[in-house]
């Protein structure tokens, strides 16, 4: 029988610990605070912003939102970032991606203070992960994948894991993190030939391609553990992942649902990183 790997159970456990830690910070008159930088008014960004603010409010984490024009000059953005880096009450900084095309992504990411880089966007923080050091901030989504697997006692050592994503946001950092846990990792992408033949041999498949219900049962074997990272909208306007959940759910060993899967843990880990930063800087 297929096991459903609910992320909201993992998130709840993390939040219970965060409540205790936030109370201790409050005794020192420290309130964890996140700065959110959003360029433009894309509906997806606004929805994500609201969900983060709502999650922060539930844990008494403060937020400061900087609503910026998509046409903002790079020098003006960097001045704002310098100000936020120097603001002692700000413990974490999150910049929504993708950036407007006229901004240099590396320059923007490099402008975030290392100790406030709660989603691991700075090249030096990413470099640390590629060197096998998982002691600092990690990208929230890849970390969420690993936290769910750990929560359900799925040992990564020696596992053959296929990641369908090669971005610096998910695929590449996740591959390095999994290697640090002694997994054997294969990265696939849009140019991969005969993808199902590769995924079907894997113990664990992580998909993050952003295509609603594209992945069907022929991609898996009966023991496959399926981690669906994507949050898409189907033809009926309902949230779904890359995997056709109803088609697959009885034909694999375990699977994360969408919603209530990886996404719920991703947001919770962002909150954890804010609290981590507040504690380190207290």
UniProtKB/Swiss-Prot annotation:
CDD domains: NAD_bind_m-THF_DH_Cyclohyd (cd01080)
Keywords: Amino-acid biosynthesis, Histidine biosynthesis, Hydrolase, Methionine biosynthesis, Multifunctional enzyme, NADP, One-carbon metabolism, Oxidoreductase, Purine biosynthesis
Annotated positions binding NADP(+): 165-167, 190, 231
Family: Belongs to the tetrahydrofolate dehydrogenase/cyclohydrolase family.
Source organism per UniProt: Clostridium botulinum (strain Langeland / NCTC 10281 / Type F)
PANTHER family referenced in this protein's UniProt entry, alphabetically: C-1-TETRAHYDROFOLATE SYNTHASE, CYTOPLASMIC (PTHR48099:SF5), C-1-TETRAHYDROFOLATE SYNTHASE, CYTOPLASMIC-RELATED (PTHR48099)
InterPro entries: Aminoacid_DH-like_N_sf (IPR046346), NAD(P)-bd_dom_sf (IPR036291), THF_DH/CycHdrlase (IPR000672), THF_DH/CycHdrlase_cat_dom (IPR020630), THF_DH/CycHdrlase_NAD-bd_dom (IPR020631)
Gene Ontology CC terms: cytosol
One BP annotation, GO: L-histidine biosynthetic process
Repressor as UniProt keyword: no
Pathway annotation from the record: One-carbon metabolism; tetrahydrofolate interconversion
Function: Catalyzes the oxidation of 5,10-methylenetetrahydrofolate to 5,10-methenyltetrahydrofolate and then the hydrolysis of 5,10-methenyltetrahydrofolate to 10-formyltetrahydrofolate.
Superkingdom assignment: Bacteria
E.C. number(s) listed in UniProt: 1.5.1.5, 3.5.4.9
Quaternary data: Homodimer.
UniProt protein name: Bifunctional protein FolD
């Amino acid at each position: 029988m297929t096991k459903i790997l609910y992320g909201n159970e993992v998130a709840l456990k993390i939040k219970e610990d965060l409540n205790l830690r936030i109370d201790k910070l409050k005794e020192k008159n420290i309130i964890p605070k996140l700065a959110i930088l959003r360029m433009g008014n894309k509906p997806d960004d606004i929805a994500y912003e609201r969900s983060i603010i709502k999650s922060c409010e539930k844990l008494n984490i403060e937020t400061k939102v900087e609503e910026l024009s998509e046409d903002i000059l790079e020098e003006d953005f960097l001045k704002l970032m310098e100000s936020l880096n120097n603001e002692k009450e700000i413990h974490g900084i999150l910049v929504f991606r993708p950036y407007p095309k006229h901004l240099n992504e590396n320059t923007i990411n490099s402008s975030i203070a290392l100790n406030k880089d709660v989603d691991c966007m700075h090249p030096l923080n990413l470099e640390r992960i590629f060197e096998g050091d998982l002691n600092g901030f990690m990208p929230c989504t890849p970390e969420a994948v690993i936290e769910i697997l750990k929560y359900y006692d799925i040992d990564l050592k020696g596992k053959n894991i296929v990641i369908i994503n090669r971005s610096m946001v998910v695929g590449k950092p996740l591959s390095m993190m999994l290697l640090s846990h002694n997994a054997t990792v294969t990265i696939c992408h849009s140019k991969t030939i005969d993808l199902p033949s590769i995924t079907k041999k894997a113990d664990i498949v992580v998909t993050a391609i952003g295509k609603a219900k594209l992945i069907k049962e022929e991609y898996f074997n009966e023991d496959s553990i399926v981690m669906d990272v994507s949050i898409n909208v189907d033809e009926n306007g309902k949230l779904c992942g890359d995997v056709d959940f109803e088609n697959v759910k009885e034909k694999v060993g375990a699977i994360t649902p969408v919603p209530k899967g990886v996404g719920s843990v991703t947001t919770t880990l962002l909150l954890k990183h804010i609290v981590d930063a507040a504690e380190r800087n207290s």
